A protein has these predicted regions:
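ABC-type nucleotide-binding domain
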Residues: 1-244
Length: 244
């Protein structure tokens, strides 16, 4: 991503000259305040939108020069607004790789925590998810989305971590899945959880104006005592809160 500028409305720029280099096989976490363009960056990589200026490249090729089929073969998406079709749970996972074996399906289900969902549902794998996946909770829908990414085995995975609090079981499964994805693919995560941020090889800190404020490892950014350290201290403090 080089000198990328983007706005949904011309009078309100979202990204202002963003540079982002993601080495193959690495994990990059993007953090920053709400509305700074973190999720927008993922959507530009996936070409949900085209940049206003600059370029997004994968392997040196501008995504605008890639066919939709080629781009989708290279990239998997795990976004917060997971959409499931009114089809069976099995087919909603298999859509990522229709030729996958039963063994492969069950392996990714175990990794993503979908097996627990299957066991809870009366119809198991053949349960209809309902339009938009309304038969499942938000955390369960994200598990299905992660299972899709694991089954697809795309070289690049874009993951927009849920901002809402997940129960302990969902949280554990998401972290475990991120660890697996990190071993298999180049992983770009919009991160909100401290544990996820610490897993990254590189952390990109966005400021409220849509610019990159800081870049580095966790230890490097803590030593800078800048925006990332403020972010870390506030999140760390809030994680210690208890109701009494």
């Amino acid at each position: 991503m080089g000198e990328v500028r983007f706005s949904y409305m011309k009078e309100k720029p979202i990204l202002r000259g963003v540079d982002l280099d993601v080495p193959e096989g690495s994990m990059v976490a993007i953090v920053g305040p709400s509305g700074c363009g973190k999720t927008t960056m993922l959507k530009l990589i996936a070409r949900f939108y085209d940049v206003d200026d600059g370029a997004v490249r994968i392997g040196g090729v501008d995504v605008r020069d890639m066919t939709t089929e080629d781009l989708f073969a290279r990239v998997s998406f795990v976004f917060q607004d997971v959409y499931l079709f009114n089809d069976t749970l099995r087919n909603n996972v298999l859509m990522a790789n229709p030729d996958a074996s039963e063994e492969q399906l069950r392996a990714v289900a175990d990794l993503a925590g979908v097996t627990e969902v299957v066991e809870r549902l009366p119809g198991g794998w053949e349960t209809l998810c309902g339009e938009g996946g309304r038969s499942l909770s938000g955390g369960e829908r994200q598990r299905v989305s992660i299972a899709r990414a694991l089954l697809k085995q795309a070289p690049i995975v874009l993951l927009d971590e849920a901002t809402s609090a997940l129960d302990a079981e969902n949280e554990k499964n998401v972290v475990r899945s991120i660890e697996t994805l990190k071993r298999r693919s180049t992983l770009i995560v919009v991160a909100h959880k401290l544990e996820t941020v610490r897993m990254a090889d590189k952390i990109v800190v966005m400021d409220s104006s849509g610019k990159v404020a800081e870049t580095g490892t966790h230890n490097e950014l803590i030593a800078l005592e800048g925006e990332y350290k403020d972010f870390w201290d506030k999140r760390n403090a809030s994680s210690q809160w208890q109701l009494v």
